[in-house]
Amino acid sequence: MMSQTLTLCCLALVACVYGNTVSTNDTACPTFCPSIYKPVCGTDGQNFKEFASTCNLLSHNCRRERNSVQAYAATDAAWCSSEFVENLHEKLGNFKLEVKECFKPCSMIYQPVCITNGKYRAELANSCLLENFNCALQVSGAQPAELFRLLREEKC
């Protein structure tokens, strides 16, 4: 009698654990995600979307895969949290870019880079200009958290 009760309890536990996921191919698909907000940014190659958690991203992907739509992959959070601006210099208040101590000759080769400071996202013609830009920002009094970093070595 005790072994039957133990077996029944084990089966109930297994059913409870696996009852929250559905499998499509090799991917476990959660049907229930805890209400814990730990945002994750995802991309399907064209669009960026913020999900409440990794679990929500996986669940969303399972529904997309069933419809043969490209799944979202987790990516840098700055893609979802930053505003894309065309003219970064103007957006930041037209600070002085021509600072003697910041001048570093850059090639005229167009190799666009996408940069961000977490708040704004923009494109520069090449990565050398990013160094000059950040130097000029520092001279104008910008805090380290306001400086820009490379998001990817291509257009945004």
Curated annotation (Swiss-Prot):
Keywords, in A-Z order: Disulfide bond, Protease inhibitor, Repeat, Serine protease inhibitor, Signal
Phenotype when changing K104M: In strain: NVIII-m11
Cysteines paired by S-S bonds: C29-C62, C33-C55, C102-C135, C106-C128, C114-C156
Ranges that cross the membrane: none
Listed result of changing M2I: In strain: Nv2001_f0516, Nv2001_f0517, Nv2001_f0565, Nv2001_f0567, Nv2001_f0622, Nv2001_f0652, Nv2001_f0665, Nv2001_f0668, Nv2001_f0684, Nv2001_f0688, Nv2001_f0763, Nv2001_f0828, Nv2001_f0811, NVIII-2, NVIII-5 and NVIII-m15
Pfam families to which the protein is assigned, alphabetical: Kazal_2
Record-annotated Kazal-like domain positions: 23-81, 96-156
Tree of life domain: Eukaryota
Site feature: Reactive bond: S35, I36, M108, I109
First and last residue of the signal peptide: 1-19
Effect of T5S: In strain: NVIII-1
GO terms, molecular function: serine-type endopeptidase inhibitor activity
Name recorded for this polypeptide: Enhancer of split M1 protein
Species of origin: Drosophila melanogaster (Fruit fly)
Gene assigned in the entry: Kaz-m1
